Design a protein with these regions (language model features):
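A phosphate-binding glycine/aspartate-rich beta-alpha loop in the early core of alpha/beta enzymes
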Residues: 91, 230, 238-301
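Intrinsically disordered, low-complexity, mixed-charge
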Residues: 4-7, 12-191, 195, 202
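A contiguous, well-structured pocket-lining segment that forms one wall/lid of small-molecule binding clefts
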Residues: 191, 198-200, 420-458, 573-711, ...
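Short glycine-rich phosphate-binding loop at a beta-alpha junction
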Residues: 232, 464-476, 709-720
Length: 769
């Protein structure tokens, strides 16, 4: 019978015994079988280890002390990339094993194992790559048990070469000898390859015609090309667009060709040491930058030593370090190079990762392609993170982190959460775990919709998933909602959730909170139960129900979503709502009088209380952004302006209504802003006072709700909390008033995190029935 791990001690394992050990978790593709082999042979144990669709199964036969040492090491010192979730130990009759062997993988009835994320090249492989005496010198696919691609090349489990895109590359005799040698770091490493037998790079022109195939020649040519040209480079999870970040011409050309006037580009640099010559890097940021996950990290600039067009008007810039041999070669003998390294995508779509798609869709943007002949099976954008008060937060959770599982209270059925339509990630729940997908971008195009369907199908295959319940957003126009309806037509149960409730439920689920919280959801939009556009929500919520307790007052959104790209229209609406004369505002906008008439006659002017839209409108009033080209551009510029006057501590006390749901007086706030402008107060000071006013009223409303509902826990979520000033001031204010404050840590606070909340609501609603 199974024996719980904690009960297995030296006293319970007898001399010459046989135990079956079933290990579940991230245990395939991480060197787990070679690790067990070394343990067993080192402790004179006989038996076997095998990958199967349930994880790893070990049979150990030997004396009690030796087996105990093996079990302790499996639990306490697994391989670096492994994550053990469960160990089940069963005592069996002696089998009479004569050796310890690694068996061929099995397919069993249930797929109950996890797939490791892609990680950066390890130090040992890095050193071999640059060692001229090593047979992998300058071989760009150098990898081992502890590093390199995993998720992006796996087509199915169990994890073997035949179920990865390495199946097209039979190992040469030298690689096969390493693969079969238990003492070698590449023992049973499925992506194992070298220049004789492995994948190869090639340099192509913009039409896809091959120019070069020899790697060192390619690298020399690419380094030269990047000075004056835009190059698409195939990386681990898709293509990057790259160019010299110091070149005004190149960066401007990239913006023109990609139709990306403002949105900042990420850069890649050679090292922390070089980065510190122009940025302030905290210890926590260094840790993230150098981690095996290698995310992009938003770092504070001290001085600009590259083109001002890389991240115009912004204090923080996205930075990453090399994570593949190819990328390290870009900086070889050129340590002070700075390259733009941005996802090759079209207007917020997912990253392009198929070669044919790259040649077809990027040829008008790039001058050259650097590609290779190994297929990317699962695309992954670079993850993006930032640090506030030494706590790391996700903007985008993808490469390096997906598809690592999150653990939850057990669900009785398979649940699919479709996520939102912006910054989409979906989620699958089965048993006691959730797999949140990689970043899929915005689902507003046929390309995005098609990839969404394909990615769900891929996840369903590799995780043996068939949804019995689908949870979606309640917005009737979302693609994800329509997708849920399609499944409903095939007999699958569906539940629709309110957007901001899902935001808060996600935080509750992540932190294991079962009691109601004061949930504060600040974002750009979300379909409300009253059919208006919410976005400044104070909810008394758990993972089944919510009560709307407070919000900012409504104002009109002239032209609906078209106003989002024209913040001046929102600013004009705020003036109209307050009765302030708009004659001195937006005088250069040709449509001004037409928009005023639309507002006055209430033609296509949906109501919103969104904090995100309020930020847009205030940025427009201060003259910072009349028109924008990317989401949150106006809000980012308003935050940047506020940073110039961060030392200003004046707090405007926004009035709050007396009855629930409490109304926060937006009109009063706009009047105060215009009054300060009339007095000649600097825009930076007004911007900072606006931030402090939002933080102050947030804390005051939370205090009112604590008094009324006797709740001391606050959950914060929504994309507006990417604002560093607002997050810091609100968290600081709440903690000073002895609230327990919870924020998303394992997922983004934006819509990339709501699928987990949808899972929690779906599970607990189903269990309640």
């Amino acid at each position: 019978m199974p024996i719980p791990y904690k009960q297995v001690t030296c006293a319970t394992i007898l001399t010459m015994v046989h135990y079956k050990i079933q290990v579940n978790g991230i245990v395939q593709g991480v060197g787990f079988r070679p690790f067990v082999y070394a343990l067993a042979t080192g402790n004179n144990c006989k038996g076997s280890v095998i990958n199967n669709t349930e994880g790893v199964t070990i049979h150990l036969e030997g004396d009690d002390q030796s087996i105990q040492q093996c079990i302790d090491a499996i639990k306490n010192s697994p391989p670096p990339l492994a994550k053990i979730i469960d160990i089940r130990i069963t005592k069996l009759p002696l089998n009479g094993y004569t050796a310890f062997t690694i068996e061929e993988s099995q397919i069993t009835t249930c797929k109950d194992t996890f797939i490791p994320p892609d990680v950066a090249i390890c130090n040992e492989c890095h050193d071999e790559f640059f060692d001229s005496t090593n047979r992998r010198y300058h071989y760009p696919f150098t990898t081992c048990t502890h590093c390199g691609p995993r998720f992006s090349i796996i087509d199915d489990i169990p994890y073997d070469r035949a179920t990865t895109s390495m199946r097209s590359f039979p190992m040469c005799s030298n690689c096969l000898a390493e693969y079969r040698n238990p003492l070698n770091r590449r023992f049973h490493t499925q992506p194992n390859a070298c220049s004789v037998c492995g994948p190869e790079y090639r340099l192509c022109d913009s039409s896809g015609k091959t120019i070069l195939t020899q790697f060192d020649a390619i690298m020399e040519q690419v380094k030269a090309l990047l000075k004056d040209h835009i190059v698409a480079i195939k990386s681990v999870g898709g293509y990057h667009l790259a160019c010299d970040a110091r070149s005004d011409r190149c960066v401007t050309l990239l913006r023109e060709r990609k139709n990306r006037p403002f949105k900042p580009f990420a850069i890649m640099v050679s090292s922390i040491e070089f980065l510190e010559t122009f940025c302030s890097v905290t210890a926590r940021e260094k840790e993230l930058l150098q981690s095996r996950e290698r995310p992009i990290v938003l770092i504070k600039l001290n001085k600009t030593i590259f083109s001002t067009h890389v991240a115009p008007h912004l204090t923080y810039i996205g930075v990453m370090l090399p994570y593949t041999p190819f990328q390290y070669m870009l900086f070889h003998n050129n340590r002070e190079s700075i390259y733009i390294m941005t996802s090759a995508n079209i207007a917020d779509e997912p990253i392009i990762y198929k070669d044919n798609d790259a040649f077809e869709r990027l040829h008008t943007i790039v001058d050259y392609f650097v590609t290779y002949n190994r297929e990317i099976i699962a695309h992954t954008d670079d993850s993006v993170m930032y640090v506030v008060d030494e706590h790391p937060f996700f903007v985008r959770r993808s490469r390096g982190y997906v598809p690592a599982p999150l653990f939850i209270k057990k669900t009785p059925l398979h649940i699919l959460a479709t996520g939102g339509d912006l910054k989409n990630s979906f989620a699958l729940a089965r048993n006691n775990f959730v797999i949140v997908s990689q970043y899929l971008g915005d689902l507003s195009t046929p390309w995005g919709n098609d990839l969404y369907r394909k990615t769900i199908a891929h996840f369903s295959k590799i995780f043996d998933f068939k949804p019995a319940l689908v949870v979606s957003d309640m917005h009737p126009g979302y693609f994800t909602t329509l997708f849920a309806h399609e499944l409903e037509e095939h007999g699958v149960q569906t539940i629709a959730t309110q957007h901001h409730h899902a935001h808060i439920a996600s935080v509750c689920q992540e932190h294991g909170i079962s009691q109601p919280v004061i949930g504060i959801a600040y974002d750009g939009t979300g379909y409300g139960t009253d059919h208006t556009l919410w976005g400044s929500e104070f909810l008394i919520a758990d993972t089944t129900t919510f009560t709307r307790a407070a919000h900012f007052d409504y104002f009109k959104l002239p032209g609906g979503e078209h106003a989002i790209n024209n913040p001046w229209k929102i600013g004009l609406s705020l003036l109209q709502c307050t009765g302030i004369d708009s004659n001195n505002f937006f005088t250069n906008e040709k449509e001004k009088f037409l928009v005023e008439e639309i507002i006055q006659k209430n033609i296509n002017c949906p109501l919103t209380c969104s904090i995100g839209r309020l930020f847009d409108g205030v940025a427009a009033l201060l003259g910072l952004a009349h028109h924008i080209s990317t989401e949150a551009e106006a809000a980012m510029l308003l935050e940047e302006e506020a940073l110039k006057a961060y030392s200003d501590t004046c707090v405007l006390s926004i009035p709050i209504s007396n009855s629930m749901p409490y109304g926060i007086n937006t009109t009063w706030l706009v009047q105060e802003i215009v009054s300060m402008m009339d007095k000649g107060i600097a825009p930076a000071t007004i911007a900072m006072r606006f931030h402090r006013a939002i933080a102050d009223v947030t804390v005051r409303v939370a205090l009112m709700l604590r008094e009324q509902f006797k709740i001391h826990s606050v959950a914060l979520s929504g994309g507006v909390f990417h604002n560093r000033i607002l997050l810091h001031c609100i968290v600081e204010g709440l903690r000073k008033n002895r609230f327990d404050v919870y924020t998303p840590l394992q997922l983004p606070c934006n819509d990339g995190g709501i699928a987990l909340g949808q899972i929690a609501i779906g599970r607990d609603t189903y269990n309640g029935h």
